Amino acid sequence: MSFADFLLIETVIYLFFALPACYSDVRKLLIPLRFVLLGFVVLTAAKLYLLHRYSANPRFFQHSMLNLLIAAATSALLYFCVRVFSAGGLGVGDIFFGVYTAVYCGFYKNLVAAAFAALSGILFYLAAAVAKKIRKRILEKSGQTEFVHRGIFVIPFVPFITFGAVLAVFLF
């Protein structure tokens, strides 16, 4: 079994659980934690099985397991700190999903994935803010006004984490 086969199996498992979480986050701003935790267990078990079955070197297996543990712990800490410093702008589901993503990516790629997720989230937020401002100007010129005043809008972050993870895994 080649590295490409490992990568394909891991990616299919990751996306099987990530895409419904993305959909739920976009539609309801809720992340199904049971589904994410089930994905975490399935992906971890698949990685353990594949690494144990096909790695000839026991030290490689140990190194890979240590990499997964460090990746999960670092991801939990990173997303928790973002949650604290953003005054709850990031939900608990995003933290759990970040840990799930860390198991998929590994330590180094997870850091790259988090950077890609943050960058794509910021770009989306800026584009949405510009679109909102343009819409407001068009309504003002036509004599209409928005009846509902909305504060700063909330963006679902799980799709950006997923995008960043897949991009990081396939680029690095």
State what each model feature region is.
Residues 1-172:
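A membrane-topology feature that recognizes alpha-helical transmembrane segments
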